[in-house]
């Protein structure tokens, strides 16, 4: 059985993220979506909210599990006995950062491979940052996120903490 980890902040989970999960879940026996705590990124949604959102969006995939984590990715990968780290590449601008991360992960986890997936064409430009900015400014994000995620965004914007 080959398990993979797809780590990210998922702030919020977008249709682009789900596209990668769908495709990766067809490749691996088990896919663990690791929702990173990422306090340095100052996420819009709390870790618990991001986990709940991801579970709502991805709950229908029988071989996909969503878990939160903090600390080093290498520890999360080991905990889940994963052999592959899945990463998305939207554009050339993502490549340099992801290439460096893959190199560091190879150093820390020599027996774990990093696999890059590019999103389907209609999702190439979507990012959680863009989605949040559009939503906060009152724009329509329905083409970028699922209805449940749009509701989460609207509720969070209406009741900021």
UniProtKB/Swiss-Prot annotation:
Binding residue positions for ATP: 9-10, 17, 88-90, 98, 123-129
Any one GO molecular-function label of the UniProt entry: ATP binding
Pfam families linked to this entry: CTP_transf_like
Record keyword Amino-acid biosynthesis present: no
Subcellular location: Cytoplasm
Annotated catalysed reactions: (R)-4'-phosphopantetheine + ATP + H(+) = 3'-dephospho-CoA + diphosphate
One of the record's GO cellular component terms: cytoplasm
Site note Transition state stabilizer, residues: 17
The protein's Enzyme Commission number: 2.7.7.3
Biochemical pathway: Cofactor biosynthesis; coenzyme A biosynthesis; CoA from (R)-pantothenate: step 4/5
Swiss-Prot/TrEMBL keywords: ATP-binding, Coenzyme A biosynthesis, Cytoplasm, Magnesium, Nucleotide-binding, Nucleotidyltransferase, Transferase
Cofactor: Mg(2+)
Coiled-coil region(s): none
A GO BP annotation: coenzyme A biosynthetic process
Binding site for substrate: 9, 41, 73, 87
The protein's enzyme class: transferase
Primary location group: cytoplasm
Family: Belongs to the bacterial CoaD family.
Subunit structure comment from the entry: Homohexamer.
Function: Reversibly transfers an adenylyl group from ATP to 4'-phosphopantetheine, yielding dephospho-CoA (dPCoA) and pyrophosphate.
NCBIfam families: coaD_prev_kdtB, cyt_tran_rel
Protein name in the entry: Phosphopantetheine adenylyltransferase
Gene: coaD
